[in-house]
Structure formats: structure tokens, C-alpha cells
Curated annotation (Swiss-Prot):
UniProt-recorded name of the protein: Adenosine deaminase 2
Region of interest (Dimerization), residue spans: 25-95
Enzyme class (EC, first level): hydrolase
Lineage: Eukaryota, Metazoa, Chordata, Craniata, Vertebrata
EC number from the UniProt entry: 3.5.4.4
Naturally occurring in which organism (per UniProt): Sus scrofa (Pig)
SUPFAM superfamilies linked to this entry: Metallo-dependent hydrolases
Alphabetized GO MF terms: adenosine deaminase activity; adenosine receptor binding; heparin binding; proteoglycan binding; zinc ion binding
Metal-binding found in the keyword field: yes
Protein encoded by which gene: ADA2
Biological process according to GO: adenosine catabolic process; inosine biosynthetic process
Length: 510
């Protein structure tokens, strides 16, 4: 019987061991969670007391939306943007993000920055606006007085005065709606309308062909720039860097302006805009050309970019190549042209689109290698970066950020559910990035808020919080082409607005 008292002691020892084991497991788990939280974008930031309260409210709303999405099976980032947009606009989180000071938009194409609705309702209603149809059914516009000469039959039908054409229509609204459909990718059934990438890119290209005759008309051009700045300013964006191809801008009498005139016009409009918009920081242009062109033409473009930057150092930030990577020339194809500045000892910053593809091992995929080798200041999209561990490591070491455009990547069919976007992994590891919107008008969006929502809810999941948003906004200034002095002023302006935003978020709805 003397052995019996030993049993409770053994049981107690086992229980204590299990308790310590469970405790150590919990501690280890918490340490892992904390390490991951510290690693993610914004994880190193320490929030002030008021920011913590604001974060608590934001995360409560976010969690409620996610719980509702789990219950209903309807989660906007998992849906195509055209079907998710209306749901997003009802979201409490989205409406908070609309008020959030976002800093800068660093990946926006000039022709895609203004609501297409304005082009239809304003630009096409101006006097002397003509249109014609190409043999393939594409619409082309031109302002002219006297009327433009009859085009060649293989190029376009006869020019028709739009004002006169509308007068003969039984339903002008339906015609205007058809124009709007021509100017955007928006459709009720995107999966059916755009069954593959070729189809969506084909329509995408026709949009810019259609609107070019409107936007490049000098009076529209000025108003277009101003309105683009207005739309982003209303969305709490104070600075933009625009990819601009600087197509010839023309007057009513047919006179065509130089690229220098266009750059000066951007400069003048931005200066005028700043006078009536407190806190607006400005714009810079990234001169761009199309990657479908021959090497000899890209050599000329690089030369032109150097000249424009020398003439407008405060306005022209650098050079990029635009257009679909999968079907265009690779950066490697253009290496001879792209080495010209370095061979002449001229600094021409590059802001290359690279890796906007889901075809691994192709020349488009390997654009990431050449963007790194050519010291691209930032990388546009970089969708394929996670498939290139060496490039990923070296680009991170060089502090080369990605310009992530979630909606663009989804609409152009690189990814369907944004929770599966490769930038979700990059965001979790803390890779430097900014959020931008590419061609928001073509997607039926405005400004940056829609992309921020997709990034915050879809890419970041529940772990992304106010720190993530704050870091992304700060990154947009840090990785901009502004000078160090300009960045300091921009950051101060942003911080002032950020504090107001946090105070309002803490107070909650009135």
C-alpha cells in the first residue's frame, strides 16, 4: 500500500509537464504570429494611441465584412471587379478608404485617368466633332473646321458631324451609352465577353484608339488633364506620376503641337490646379513608347526621353515601355537602345513594366531580369516576381518597389480571385510596394480607392491593418520621383491629412 501515494505525484508531474508543454506551444505560436506580423508591409510601424483606437474600429468593420462574406459566400475581392464594384461601394471599409490620404499614384496611364462618362457627355458634345468607322468597326473621332478631308476607304468611312448625327437619332441616350461601352471594358458578363487574355487586350487597345482623337484635341486635352487631377484629388491623392506617350496634340484648324508643347501644357495645368487645391503637390511624366515598335524606333524614343528630361528636369521623370508584354518586344530585345544613356554618361531613370504575365519562362516573364539589370527605379506590375527568387532577393536588396495594380491584373485576366494575387505573398513578407490603378477609367473605376480596397481586403486579408495602409501611403511618397526636398514637403502635407483622417476615424460616424 505504501506505493499508492506515488501515483498522485506522478499524475501531477505529468499534468504539470503537459501544462508547460501546452504553454510553451502557445508561446511559440504567439512568437510566430508576432514575427509574421512584424514582417508584413507596415509591420515595423508603431501606431500612436489615437491610431490604435482608429485601427480597432477599422479592424472591427473589416472583420464584420469578412464574417458576412463567409456567411453569404459573396466576397468582392473574389469576384470580377465589374461584378464587385457595386458591392464595394456599399462597404463601410471602402468608404473609410475613400477618405484616407493615399499620398501618390505612381502607376497611371494618362489616357486612362479620367472617367469615360465625361468624354461622352462633354468632349463628344463640343462643336465640330466628327466620327468615322474603320473597316473593322472601330470608332475614330476628330475635331475639325472646315470639315476634315474624306479619308481613304481602307482607313475609315466618311467623316460624320456628331452634332448632326445625334439630331437624327430617335434615342440619343442609347447612342451615348453605346459610346460609353466603346470607351470602357465594363460589361455585365466579363467571363463570357472576355473568354481569354487575347480578347480582353483586343478590346483594351480599341479603347485608346477610339478616344485618342478626342483627348488629343488641344481644348479637350487641357480640360482632360485638369479633370484627371481633380478625380484623384477628390480621392485623396495629392501627387501623380503619369505614363505619357505624348501623342501629337492638334488644334481645330489641323495645326499639330510638339511634344515639348504637351509637356509644358501638363506643367501649366498642374500649376493652375494647385492654386485652387490646397495640399496638391504636383505631377511628373514618365515618357513612354510602345513595345510593339522596332529597335531603331525605340532608340529614337530613348534619345527623345533624354532630351525631354534635359529640357524639363522637374517634369519628366524618366522612360518606360508600355503595351502587352506577352505579344510585344522584350526588354532584352531593346537592350541596345536601353543602354544608350549609360554609354553616354546620361542619367535616364527607367520605370519599366515587367513581368505582367502568367507565362513562366517566356521573354515577357524574363523582363524582370532585365528590369533589374537595367536598374529600373520601380517595376510596373511585377506580377511574376514571386516566380523569380534571385530577382526577388536582388530587387529587394536594391530597394526596387513594385507598382501593384490589383484591378488591372484581374480585369486583364492574370488572376481571378484577388486573394490569390502573387502580391499577397509579397505583402506578407514586407516587400516594398505601392498600390496604383493603371487605367482606372477603362475599368469603370476612379482614383485609387477601389484598388486600395482590393489590396486591403483581398491581398492583405485579416492581418492587414492601419499599419499596412499607412506604410503603403508613405511608400508612395518615398518611392516617387520627387527630389528629397520635395519628398519632405509631400510627407509633411500627407502627415497633416493623415492625423485628421485618424481623428475622424476614431470618432466614428456622426
Amino acid at each position: 500500500m505504501s506505493g499508492w501515494p506515488v501515483l498522485p505525484a506522478l499524475l501531477l508531474a505529468v499534468a504539470m509537464s503537459s501544462f508547460h508543454s501546452a504553454t510553451s506551444r502557445d508561446e511559440e505560436r504567439n512568437r510566430l504570429l508576432m514575427r509574421e506580423k512584424m514582417m508584413q508591409v507596415g509591420g515595423q510601424l508603431v501606431l500612436q494611441e489615437e491610431e490604435e483606437r482608429a485601427n480597432g474600429r477599422l479592424q472591427a468593420l473589416k472583420e464584420a465584412e469578412m464574417q458576412e462574406a463567409k456567411r453569404t459566400g459573396i466576397f468582392p475581392p473574389s469576384l470580377h471587379f465589374f461584378q464587385a464594384k457595386g458591392l464595394m461601394e456599399k462597404s463601410a471599409v471602402f468608404n473609410i478608404l475613400k477618405k484616407m490620404p493615399k499620398g501618390a499614384a505612381l502607376h497611371v496611364h494618362d489616357f486612362g485617368m479620367v472617367s469615360m462618362d465625361w468624354l461622352v457627355k462633354n468632349a463628344t458634345y463640343r462643336p465640330y466633332c466628327y466620327f468615322c468607322l474603320t473597316p473593322k468597326g472601330a470608332t475614330q473621332f476628330k475635331f475639325a473646321h472646315p470639315p476634315p478631308p474624306t479619308p481613304k476607304q481602307e482607313e475609315c468611312s466618311e467623316w460624320v458631324l456628331l452634332e448632326k448625327f445625334r439630331k437624327g437619332l430617335p434615342n440619343v441616350t442609347e447612342f451615348d451609352n453605346s459610346l460609353l461601352r466603346t470607351f470602357t471594358l465594363m460589361t455585365e458578363n466579363p467571363q463570357e465577353t472576355y473568354a481569354n487574355q487575347d480578347m480582353v487586350w483586343k478590346k483594351f487597345k480599341t479603347i485608346f484608339f477610339a478616344i485618342s482623337g478626342l483627348v488629343n484635341y488641344a481644348p479637350v486635352f487641357r480640360d482632360f488633364i485638369f479633370l484627371g487631377l481633380e478625380e484623384f484629388y477628390q480621392d485623396q491623392v495629392l501627387y501623380l506620376e503619369l505614363r505619357a506617350m505624348l501623342y501629337p496634340v492638334y488644334e481645330l484648324n489641323g495645326m499639330v503641337h510638339s511634344r515639348e508643347w504637351s509637356v509644358r501644357t501638363y506643367e501649366e495645368v498642374a500649376r493652375t490646379f494647385a492654386k485652387t487645391h490646397p495640399g496638391f503637390i504636383g505631377i511628373k511624366l514618365i515618357y513612354s513608347d510602345h513595345r510593339s515598335k522596332d529597335v531603331s524606333l525605340i532608340k529614337e524614343s530613348v534619345q527623345r526621353a533624354m532630351e525631354l528630361r534635359a529640357k524639363f528636369p522637374q517634369m519628366v521623370a524618366g522612360f518606360d515601355l508600355v503595351g502587352r508584354e506577352d505579344t510585344g518586344h522584350s526588354l532584352y530585345d531593346y537592350k541596345e537602345a536601353l543602354m544608350i544613356p549609360a554609354s553616354r554618361g546620361v542619367k535616364l531613370p527607367y520605370f519599366f513594366h515587367a513581368g505582367e504575365t502568367d507565362w513562366q519562362g517566356t521573354s515577357a516573364d524574363r523582363n524582370l531580369l532585365d528590369a533589374l539589370i537595367l536598374n529600373s527605379t520601380r517595376i510596373g506590375h511585377g506580377f511574376a516576381l514571386s516566380k523569380h527568387p534571385a530577382v526577388w532577393a536582388d530587387a529587394w536588396r536594391k530597394d526596387i518597389p513594385l507598382e501593384v495594380c490589383p484591378i488591372s491584373n484581374q480585369v486583364l485576366k492574370l488572376v481571378s480571385d484577388l486573394r490569390n494575387h502573387p502580391a499577397a505573398v509579397l505583402m506578407a513578407t514586407g516587400y516594398p510596394m505601392v498600390i496604383s490603378s493603371d487605367d482606372p477609367a477603362a475599368f469603370g473605376a476612379k482614383g485609387l480607392s477601389y484598388d486600395f480596397y482590393e489590396a486591403f481586403m483581398g491581398l492583405g486579408g485579416l492581418t492587414a491593418d492601419l499599419r499596412t495602409l499607412k506604410q503603403l501611403a508613405m511608400n508612395s511618397i518615398r518611392y516617387s520621383a520627387l527630389s528629397e526636398t520635395e519628398k519632405k514637403v509631400a510627407m509633411e502635407t500627407w502627415e497633416e491629412r493623415w492625423h485628421r483622417f485618424v481623428a475622424e476615424l476614431t470618432r466614428g460616424p456622426k
